[in-house]
A protein has these predicted regions:
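Soluble, non-transmembrane domains of envelope/secretory-pathway proteins that act on or interact
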Residues: 1, 42, 228, 243, ...
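N-terminal type II signal-anchor transmembrane helix
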Residues: 1-42, 83, 103
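Non-catalytic, structured segments within soluble enzyme domains
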Residues: 11-14, 107-288, 423, 427-439, ...
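Active-site SXXK
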Residues: 76-77, 222, 290, 317, ...
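Short, well-structured active-site flanking segments
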Residues: 85-95, 167-170, 229-232, 335, ...
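Conserved catalytic neighborhood of penicillin-recognizing serine enzymes
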Residues: 104-128, 182, 247-270, 363-418, ...
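Active-site loop and adjoining helix of the penicillin-binding protein/serine DD-peptidase-beta-lactamase fold
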Residues: 140, 196-214, 274-286, 296, ...
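A penicillin-recognizing enzyme superfamily signal
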Residues: 280-300, 310-311, 322, 329-341, ...
Length: 710
């Protein structure tokens, strides 16, 4: 009686412990997720290009169950856990069978580990013991409560060992057969899925006879467990092909692991936030053509050893190619990605300054600008050749890349406004960041690229022009979805069409088929040679120089970088024609301009001509013809030249009122239209300049400067 009571108590205690044990266990999936898979990189067509091995140097991939052949799934269930879908993590029927077989034989000849228990063992390896088995069983039941059978089977097939450093069905399929797991037939699946019991003993590359014996046993298990019809096991074993690869040569895994396009993949991985399947926008064929062209041109430049290029698809804003080094394996600095390095940009920033001036209504392509010696304090810029042209059209000043006209425009726009512009183009840090103070120290010299910018950021900025003035961050991924707040209108389509017209006026030597809008740049001291060009389809940036900063006489944008840019574009369009430029006639209407100033003609302008203007931005009237001096100026009634205190929302609401009506209003060089005298406009803290212009030319313009403080 006492013995029976004790047995009953022990049984009750054991059953209670068995029932409650899972509630004291944590989820094994948390440890599985620490076993990260290989990172795979794919091109824009979905072709696998590169594999980075795991942190523990394993071959392991995470693929969904749907990408594993049903044959492989059936084989693994038959061989490892035929009643997988009928238990809760522990197969009590298998436990009873194993216990009886082991008891009657006097030794352990059979196990009862389910797929769930094996997965726990993979997640949390422990020394084998009865205690370990109990813990595994409890954790397996916990896992089954938290996760579906589909999830558990997927994790298992992705993590089971297949010999050496091969883990998971996908890595095994690639290593042993050169196939994806989806392509495995029944013979191949049965050979592979026999490995996990003793992975290294059954490896077909080292022990083919043992592997075939194990395969035959697995096929018999499939037949016995109802996964195959009677007689099918022998039929598959004898007749279905085993497409084993030639083991005398390295596997595809090895070839995918070789260095290639590393700089591109690094950028893509960062953007993908370290995802393990990275869908890159790279075009490998274009990249190879670009790399070849850069290498050919470097050999022709004395004292020049490095080059880089970035190619952006204007429609998608995808970085189609990034070449950051000519030889990644160069022991000195081959792994330095010069496409993201900060270098002096020379004259490459000038188109952005002209764009801003056009959008401010300050000028058009026919406006006359001075090219004479100029001094601002201690700063006295000169042109590259040391010569001056006195006066010339804006289009010529930009096309010839003259320095003093660009500096004059920055002075009129103000350096603060230009720095804000560069921030909008992501060429500099945001204006509210500490780094923005560094930009402000450069003053007017920012027109000549003294701040330093990267090839990638400059190419991204140039891509705004063929995109009609809309900034969208460039992406290295085909899966990127840019949030709406990242899209920003920087320039009007009118101004972009005008700059494109100017930059494509001079054809590059060798540009026989494409028709490129282009701009070169040379840093002070011949340290860097740049050329940026774009078509309706692509934006391309090219840099030549030395990574160690060593100058060379050959480093001139027009003679070093421009020829390479032409060759690359011709290579890109080798098998296709470029898209035509969109019709810009509606954006660039012809209007009367003053022959003396190239500004909007007034009745005071005795000589006039018809010139190109912007459709959406009024060009400022000519103020150089003599009648202006005889006219009474407009009186700006509000605001007054004084200090205003901002309201609670951080702005000051002020009316714009003048002594006459109508009036064209400009705020900080931005045209805002004909405001009603009863409308209020919000002004942020800082210095502001209001300019009033009479559209009827009966009064001369006037301006007022005031300050808003917090």
């Amino acid at each position: 009686m006492v013995v029976c009571a004790a047995a009953a108590l022990f049984g009750a205690a054991a059953w209670t412990a068995w029932s409650l044990a899972p509630s004291f266990c944590s989820d094994p999936f948390t440890d599985l997720k620490k076993q990260t898979p290989c990172r795979s990189y794919y091109d824009r067509q979905g072709k696998l290009l590169h594999i980075e091995r795991t942190y523990d140097y394993q071959w392991r991939f995470d693929i969904p169950l749907e990408q594993i052949s049903q044959e492989a799934v059936d084989v693994i269930l038959a061989a490892e856990d035929a009643r997988f879908y009928g238990h809760n993590g522990v197969d009590l029927q298998a436990v009873a069978r194993a216990a009886w077989q082991n008891l009657t034989s006097g030794r352990i000849i059979s196990g009862a580990s389910t797929i769930s228990m094996q997965l726990v063992s993979i997640a949390r390896p422990r020394k084998r013991s009865f205690k370990t088995k109990f813990i595994q069983a409890a954790e397996a039941r916990k896992m089954e409560k938290l996760h579906s059978k589909h999830e558990i089977l997927t994790e298992y097939l992705n993590r089971i060992p297949f010999g050496g450093k091969i883990h998971g069905i996908q890595a095994a399929a690639i290593y042993y057969f050169g196939l994806d797991a989806k392509a495995l037939n029944r013979a191949e699946a049965s050979l592979l899925c026999g490995l996990p019991q003793r992975p290294n003993a059954y490896r077909p590359d080292r022990h083919p006879e043992q592997a075939r014996k194990r395969q035959k046993l697995v096929l018999k298990l499939m037949e016995r467990n109802g996964f195959l019809k009677p007689g099918m096991a022998e039929e598959i074993y004898e007749n279905e092909p085993l497409r084993l690869r030639d083991f005398r040569y390295p596997s595809a895994l090895r070839s995918y692991a070789r260095p290639s396009h590393r700089h591109y993949f690094t950028m893509a991985r960062r953007e993908a936030r370290n995802a393990f399947d990275v869908k890159c926008a790279i075009d490998v064929e274009f990249t190879e053509r670009i790399q070849h062209a850069l290498s050919q041109h470097v050999q022709q430049l004395q004292g020049v050893h490095d080059a880089a290029a970035v190619l952006i698809d204007n429609r998608t804003r995808q970085v189609v190619s990034l070449v950051g080094t000519l030889d990644y394996n160069d022991p000195l600095n081959g792994q330095v990605n010069v496409a993201t390095a900060i270098r002096s940009a020379g004259s490459t920033l000038k188109p952005f300054i002209y764009l801003e001036a056009f959008d401010a209504g300050l000028a058009t392509m026919d406006t006359i600008i001075k090219d004479t010696p100029i001094r601002f304090g201690d700063y006295a810029p000169t042109n590259y050749d040391g010569r001056f042209n006195q006066k010339l059209r804006i289009a010529e000043a930009l096309s010839l890349s003259l320095n003093t006209p660009a500096v004059r425009l920055v002075a009129e726009l103000t350096p603060e406004r230009v720095i804000d512009l560069f921030a909008s183009l992501r060429l500099t840090a945001p204006t509210d960041s500490p780094d923005a103070q560094t930009a402000k120290k450069h003053g007017l010299s920012i027109a000549l690229g003294t701040m330093g910018h990267s090839l990638l950021n400059l190419a991204q900025g140039y891509a705004v022009i063929p995109n009609g003035g809309l900034f969208t961050p460039a992406t290295f991924l085909t899966t990127s979805s840019t949030p709406p707040e990242e899209h920003e209108r920087v320039f009007t389509p009118d101004a972009c069409a005008l700059v494109t017209k100017i930059l494509s006026m001079r054809r590059l030597a060798g540009d026989v088929s494409v028709g490129i809008a282009w701009k070169t740049g040379t840093s002070n001291g011949n340290h860097d040679a740049w050329c940026f060009g774009y078509t309706a389809d692509y934006t391309l940036g090219v840099w030549f120089g030395n990574k160690n900063g060593r100058p060379a006489a050959a480093l001139v944008g027009a003679s070093a970088a421009a020829p390479a840019l032409v060759d690359i574009f011709n290579a890109i369009y080798r098998n296709s024609a470029p898209s035509p430029w969109p019709d810009s006639s509606a954006l660039l209407p012809l209007r009367p301009l003053c022959a003396k100033s190239g500004l909007a003609a007034t009745p005071s302008c005795l000589k006039q001509f018809t010139g190109t203007t912007l459709q959406s931005i009024p060009l400022r009237p000519c103020d150089q013809c003599g009648v202006f001096a005889k006219k009474a100026p407009i009186t700006i009634l509000s605001p007054q030249p004084e200090h205003y205190v901002a309201d609670g929302d951080g702005t000051a609401k002020l009316r714009l009122r003048a002594s006459i009506s109508p009036v064209l209003w400009y705020v900080d060089n931005d045209y805002i239209g004909e405001n009603s005298p009863f409308d209020k406009r919000a002004f942020a803290p800082g210095r502001h300049v209001i300019r009033a212009v009479d559209p009827n030319d009966t009064a001369s313009p006037a301006s007022v400067t005031f300050v808003v403080t917090k």
